[in-house]
From Swiss-Prot:
Subcellular location: Endoplasmic reticulum membrane
One GO CC term, this protein: endoplasmic reticulum
Protein function: Ethylene receptor related to bacterial two-component regulators. Acts as a redundant negative regulator of ethylene signaling.
Gene: ERS1
Keyword annotations: ATP-binding, Copper, Disulfide bond, Endoplasmic reticulum, Ethylene signaling pathway, Kinase, Membrane, Metal-binding, Nucleotide-binding, Phosphoprotein, Receptor, Transferase, Transmembrane, Transmembrane helix, Two-component regulatory system
Protein name as catalogued: Probable ethylene response sensor 1
Catalytic activity line of the entry: ATP + protein L-histidine = ADP + protein N-phospho-L-histidine
PTM annotation (Phosphohistidine): residues: H353
Residue intervals passing through the bilayer: 23-43, 53-73, 95-115
Matching SUPFAM superfamilies: ATPase domain of HSP90 chaperone/DNA topoisomerase II/histidine kinase (SSF55874), GAF domain-like (SSF55781), Homodimeric domain of signal transducing histidine kinase (SSF47384)
Native species: Oryza sativa subsp. japonica (Rice)
Domain of life (superkingdom): Eukaryota
Listed EC numbers: 2.7.13.3
GO molecular-function terms, A-Z: ATP binding; ethylene binding; ethylene receptor activity; metal ion binding; phosphorelay sensor kinase activity
Tissue specificity field: Highly expressed in anthers and at lower levels in roots, leaves and hulls.
């Protein structure tokens, strides 16, 4: 029976197997018991865990598994029925809990997987937020640099300083190797290198404005990358450079510079641009980032605004200098004009005395000669001399009065005077002249015309005499009518013009004087010039009449000084004319003093001029003066 021995000699003995199983079950039970303790510890440390009841169930499963292994230690030797029962209960409990845990994990595992998915999503979201925060920080940094550059650029209004500051600040902020500005030439056909940062090459080089790269930069409102071999990128020497740098270019609008003509600015007929070129260091692998290009674009816009402000300032300074020069020239011209006016006034003052004295003597002697026995030929010659002398005296007075009116030195002599006496004096001068031409003269004074008034008696009489004299002068036959009246308050609006605004008052009234004749009349086209000095109408019926053309011009100045308005109406040549003027006079309270008083006036000479003539003896002086005055009045 030796061949039936089946025990292999290399297999360990039963005691050794039992020993290994015993030790393994012990460590398995120890591990099973430690796992729930670890779960309980970490769950307690966690402030939030949604699956506590799952952990409790899982922990019970592990504890029961460990208990089965622990009870199994007593089953390797002879054991009682109680141990077998405990082992059976433990395994049944473990089986029940294990199945329940397995069924529960079917529902729990998808939730755990979704938690992991959400974790990955949150992680990706956090990374995206980190990138956005980095972009925001970059934008804030860019904005800070833009504000700094803008402040530096706008700290001055000198365009050369603006461009130099821009290049320096951009070079420092972006770490540029070179930065340059190409400005359009005066002809507008090329771009000229005007400013560089490092001054590595001499400014003044030009490139054609028709190059494709130039058109590409002009057509884009963004900063773009251009080839390093482009003519615009030739802003630093090429020797010793092996790594080509990245070059960016952006257009700089020249805003509104076409409105200014400033020294070396180009003459622009349309919107034009300069080009700013920026070069990164060639010894690095740097590339242009989007935020850097955006910074360059913003700075280019700020430079454009600053250059336009500088252009406006330069133009305003040039205009100010030109205005100062013009003011100096005007002041010099004003002084020269004042000197000329003073010289003219001095000349007129001398001529007033030097010409009137012999003229008065000629008039006086001519008047005396007419009182003597003369032949018809002699009388005709003397009358011609007297008429010419009177005309010359009138011209002298007109020129003197006009010069005073033009330089503003003539002032009205406001005083109370006899208004009716003025018209009587005028008639005493006009009627003898009209009688020679067989003209009838009539005067009509309104019943409500005040006896006295307050104003310039001399200028009023001179105005009426000038107009009446013209009426007699230009009338061959017919009559002359002078009408004087007071303008009613409710009729003042009829006389209003853009330059004349009469207003009623208790202290003054408006005198209306109208002088109508049946003379040669005035053509409609000549009416606008009748009050212009040295202007004379020349209709057919006016030929042969002499005059200076100053009479009506002086009358208009006098009427304006007296706060009035004058105008002339005529229906045409040969239909006569009517001159009307309205002046403002003051109301005089004391009328008794003017009942019988006539103010002696001499016309056309001024009130302070005396007629000087030969006086044979003192007793005959008064008689000679009366004879001179009578003859002088008749000869006007």
């Amino acid at each position: 029976m030796d061949g039936c021995d089946c025990i292999e000699p290399l297999w360990p003995t039963d005691e050794l197997l039992i020993k290994y199983q015993y030790i393994s079950d012990f460590f398995i039970a120890l591990a099973y018991f430690s796992i729930p303790l670890e779960l309980i510890y970490f769950v307690k440390k966690s402030s939030f865990f949604p699956y506590r009841w799952v952990l409790i169930q899982f922990g019970a499963f592990i504890v029961l598994c460990g208990a089965t292994h622990l009870i199994n230690l007593w089953t390797f030797t002879t054991h009682t029925k109680t141990v077998a029962m405990v082992m059976t209960v433990a395994k049944v409990s473990t089986a029940v809990v294990s199945c329940a845990t397995a069924l529960m994990l079917v529902h729990i595992i998808p939730d755990l997987l979704s938690v992991k998915t959400r974790e990955l999503f949150l992680k990706n979201k956090a990374e995206q937020l980190d990138r956005e925060m980095g972009l925001i920080r970059t934008q804030e940094e860019t904005g800070r640099h833009v504000r700094m550059l803008t402040h530096e650029i706008r700290s001055t209004l000198d365009r050369h300083t603006i461009l130099k500051t821009t290049l320096v600040e951009l070079g420092g902020t972006l770490g540029l190797e070179e930065c340059a500005l190409w400005m359009p030439s005066r002809s507008g056909s090329s771009l000229q290198l005007s400013h560089t940062l490092r001054h590595q090459i001499t400014v003044g080089s030009t490139v054609s404005i028709n190059l494709p790269v130039v058109n590409q930069v002009f057509s884009s409102n963004r900063a773009i990358i251009i080839p390093h071999t482009s003519p615009l990128a030739r802003i630093r020497p090429l020797a010793g450079r092996y790594v080509p740098p990245e070059v960016a270019a952006v257009r700089v609008p020249l805003l509104h510079l076409s409105n200014f003509q400033i020294n070396d600015w180009p003459e622009l007929s349309a919107k034009s641009y300069a080009i700013m070129v920026l070069m990164l260091p060639s010894d690095s692998a740097r590339k242009w980032h989007v935020h850097e290009l955006e910074l360059v674009e913003v700075v280019a816009d700020q430079v454009a605004v600053a250059l336009s402000h500088a252009a406006i300032l330069e133009e305003s300074m040039r205009a100010r200098d030109l205005l100062m020069e013009q003011n100096v020239a005007l002041d010099l011209a004003r002084r020269e004009a004042e000197m000329a006016i003073r010289a003219r006034n001095d000349f007129l003052a001398v001529m007033n005395h030097e010409m009137r004295t012999p003229m008065n003597a000629i008039i006086a002697l001519s008047s005396l000669l007419l009182e003597t026995e003369l032949t018809p030929e002699q009388r005709l010659m003397v009358e011609t001399v007297l008429k010419s002398s009177n005309l010359l005296a009138t011209l002298i007075n007109d020129v003197l009065d006009l010069s005073k009116l033009e330089d503003g030195s003539l002032e009205l002599e406001i005083k109370a005077f006899n208004l009716h006496a003025v018209f009587k004096e005028v008639m005493s001068f006009i009627k003898p002249i009209a009688a020679i031409k067989r003209l009838s003269v009539s005067v009509m004074l309104a019943p409500d015309l005040p006896l006295c008034a307050i104003g310039d008696e001399k200028r009023l009489m001179q105005t009426i005499l000038n107009i009446s004299g013209n009426a007699v002068k230009f009338t061959k036959e017919g009559h002359i009518t002078l009408v004087a009246s007071v303008v009613k308050a409710d009729s003042l609006r009829e006389f209003r013009t853009p330059d004349f605004h009469p207003t009623a008052s208790d202290d003054n009234f408006y005198l209306k004087v109208q002088i109508k004749d049946t003379g040669c009349g005035i053509s409609p086209q000549d009416l606008p010039q009748v009050f212009t000095k040295f202007a004379q109408s020349q209709p057919g019926g006016n030929r042969g009449y002499s005059g200076s053309g100053l009479g009506l011009a002086i009358c208009k100045r006098f009427v304006t000084l007296m706060g009035g308005h004058i105008w002339l109406d005529s229906e045409g040549t040969g239909r006569g004319c009517t001159v009307t003027f309205v002046i403002q006079l003051g109301i005089c309270d004391n009328t008794n003093a003017y009942q019988q008083k006539l103010i002696p006036l001499v016309w056309p000479s001024s009130g302070d001029a005396d007629f000087v003539g030969p006086v044979p003896n003192a007793p005959n002086e008064e008689k000679g003066q009366a004879s001179l005055k009578s003859r002088y009045q008749r000869s006007i």
